């Protein structure tokens, strides 16, 4: 793939790996583009590449840690990781972090079983198990009960039993069937800086969810960062720390989740879809 971007690069080649995270099989889970860089490119170039990739998130990383990162938690491989949607840079993305760990631990450091990532959300860690699963360690995110926003309820077309706000807006429904049947009008969502999560007790897992946000990808296939908020909620309501979860998007995804103090551990598999090269060509 050749992309004309602002700047002077000659014909700089950048590897691109598309990896499905939280995937039971090919064509499931959430795809992320993973792009290792020798050094950071200008932010506008990163944004253009993410827009061209047109996936929910593109993960860019470099082995060059910024001075304010401090020391990584251990001596395992550590990189500086950033996430971009097709529209803007974001503060946290679980599935793209897991996908990046899979690429690093499979391609660059096959003898290691842990990778650290310095991000806008601080240090994150992913471990690889003996069964080739990946364990993503995220900060547990709080939620506060609120009165449901009538405009949001109307746009989602659901009848929530409960509404909470935090990193995302959460509407708790009565059943898995209601979550599965929901047909939100995402374009009618009120102006929100956050995503909207529909969740309920599950028939096929301890809890289920779907994640919506206006933009290039209105429904996210599997959202690791949303589970950093959902796991503390459901662990408290169900009275146990170890939970199973399903995200009921068209692609679908399964997660095993643990609330460990102020951290959330998410376990899933990764499937590599493609490896390629992007040529950043000077515009003509």
What are these regions (language model features)?
Residues 3-92, 97-284:
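Active-site proximal loop and beta-alpha junction motif in alpha/beta enzyme cores
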């Amino acid at each position: 793939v050749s992309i004309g971007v602002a700047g002077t690069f000659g014909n700089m080649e950048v590897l691109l790996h598309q990896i499905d995270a939280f995937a039971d099989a090919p064509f499931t889970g959430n795809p992320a583009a993973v792009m290792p860089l020798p050094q950071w490119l200008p932010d506008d170039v990163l944004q253009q590449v993410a827009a061209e990739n047109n996936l929910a998130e593109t993960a860019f990383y470099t082995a060059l840690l910024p001075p304010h990162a401090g020391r990584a938690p251990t001596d395992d491989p550590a990189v500086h990781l950033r996430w971009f949607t097709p529209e803007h840079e974001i503060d946290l993305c679980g599935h793209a972090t897991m996908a990046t760990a899979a690429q690093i631990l499979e391609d660059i450091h096959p003898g290691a079983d842990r990778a650290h990532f310095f991000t806008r959300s601080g240090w994150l860690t992913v471990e690889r198990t003996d069964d080739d699963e990946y364990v993503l360690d995220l900060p547990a995110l709080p939620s506060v009960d609120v009165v449901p926003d009538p405009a949001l309820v109307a746009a989602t077309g659901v009848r929530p039993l409960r509404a909470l706000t935090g990193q995302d807006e959460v509407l708790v429904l009565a059943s898995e069937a209601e979550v599965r049947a929901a047909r939100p009008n995402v374009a009618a969502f009120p102006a929100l800086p956050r995503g909207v999560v529909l969740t309920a007790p599950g028939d096929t897992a301890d809890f289920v969810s779907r994640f919506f946000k206006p933009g290039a990808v209105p429904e996210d296939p599997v959202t690791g960062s949303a589970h950093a908020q959902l796991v503390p909620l459901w662990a408290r309501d169900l009275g146990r720390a170890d939970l199973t979860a399903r995200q009921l998007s068209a692609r679908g995804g399964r997660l095993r989740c643990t609330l460990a103090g102020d951290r959330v551990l998410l376990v899933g598999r990764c499937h590599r879809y493609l490896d390629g090269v992007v040529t950043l060509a000077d515009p003509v």
